[in-house]
């Protein structure tokens, strides 16, 4: 079995070029951009989601203190979740793979599958080091 050695879909929110690509900047995307840049590691989560709990545990177990935004408790959680689903390219608002969503160094890493694949293939630690979230 082979794993991809580079992070998938990593890009800065500002590189989306809201105006340049003909995309209309909506409030959800602007909130994501702002929140994703507040800390080296940012996790958008739901407080009752077991996959979200696992990702938070992974980072905390590595000695990383992520900023966690529980969307079910956030006043704009619904807008943010819909915008995250669009960013990930998920088909529906109840898409099972949509949360958690992780940003490292302001760049979108992705949902649980991409975070775990990056961890398994060894590319997660360098991302964390580059973002200043991990000192090894």
From Swiss-Prot:
Source taxon at top rank: Eukaryota
Motif residue range(s): Responsive for interaction with TGA factors: 133-136
Keywords: Cytoplasm, Disulfide bond, Electron transport, Nucleus, Redox-active center, Transport
Database matches in Pfam families: Glutaredoxin
Major place of residence: cytoplasm
GO biological process: negative regulation of DNA-templated transcription; negative regulation of transcription by RNA polymerase II; petal development; petal formation; stamen morphogenesis
Cysteine-cysteine disulfides: 49-52
Domain Glutaredoxin positions: 29-135
GO cellular component, as recorded: cytoplasm; nucleus
Gene3D superfamilies: Glutaredoxin (3.40.30.10)
Location of the protein in the cell: Cytoplasm; Nucleus
Disruption outcome: Plants show a reduced number of petal primordia and abnormalities during further petal development. Defection in sporogenous cell formation in adaxial anther lobes when associated with the disruption of GRXC8/ROXY2 leading to fertility defects.
Reported tissue expression: Highly expressed in inflorescences, roots, and siliques. Expressed at lower levels in mature flowers.
UniProt keyword Transport present: yes
Similarity section: Belongs to the glutaredoxin family. CC-type subfamily.
NCBIfam families: GlrX-like_plant
Chain's role: Has a glutathione-disulfide oxidoreductase activity in the presence of NADPH and glutathione reductase. Reduces low molecular weight disulfides and proteins. Involved in flower development as a regulator of petal primorida initiation and further petal morphogenesis. May mediate post-translational modifications of target proteins required for normal petal organ initiation and morphogenesis. ROXY1/TGA protein interactions can occur in vivo and support their biological relevance in petal development. May be involved in the regulation of the floral regulator class C gene AG (AGAMOUS).
Subunit text: Interacts with TGA2, TGA3, TGA7 and PAN. Interacts with TGA9 and TGA10 in the nucleus.
Name of the protein described by the UniProt record: Glutaredoxin-C7
Organism, scientific name: Arabidopsis thaliana (Mouse-ear cress)
């Amino acid at each position: 079995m082979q794993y991809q050695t580079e992070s998938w879909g990593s890009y800065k929110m500002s590189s989306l070029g809201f105006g340049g690509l003909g995309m209309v900047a909506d409030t959800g995307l602007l909130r994501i951009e702002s929140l994703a840049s507040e800390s080296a590691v940012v996790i958008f989560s739901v407080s009752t989601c077991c996959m979200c709990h696992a990702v938070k545990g992974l980072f905390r177990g590595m000695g990383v203190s992520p900023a966690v935004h529980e969307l079910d408790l956030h006043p704009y959680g619904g807008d943010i979740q819909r915008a995250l689903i669009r960013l990930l390219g998920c088909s529906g608002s109840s898409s099972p793979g949509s949360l958690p969503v992780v940003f490292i160094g302001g760049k979108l890493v992705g949902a649980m599958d991409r975070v775990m694949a990056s961890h398994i293939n060894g590319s997660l630690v360098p991302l964390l080091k580059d973002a200043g979230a991990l000192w090894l």
